[in-house]
């Protein structure tokens, strides 16, 4: 049996941090497996028996994008922390740190545009990763400010569903006019 991350985490002598990203995309069997790890810091493997955390149990972080509901049993074994989208100031500082070459006015307009988009009824709201990707794209295109044509041409960077792109395309002129002020 080749040790995978869960088994390695339990065997780590000095303890460790285990990140299980996007748990909502895992199947129910994996969720069930996690119940034993999170409650008893052990895993039962029919071929080799029960493996317990050696000295210090791992610190486990689970992330979810809420694509499906996770089980109540798993929720009971976790502390819940909701991280909302950043406000304008924080998002601006994140963009400045991750895309330092972005012109200040473009950064202001981009962040405001994203904040406005998040108020719309979209299938998937743009996350900070999409904002960063869009900022990098606009810098590569030598944009100095958000022009409606460029916004329409690059909406696929921030919106992941064609329906959202089509809906927002009709709003681009109004949104860019609003943030130009």
Predicted region positions:
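C-terminal regulatory/interaction module of P-loop NTP-utilizing enzymes
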Residues: 1-181
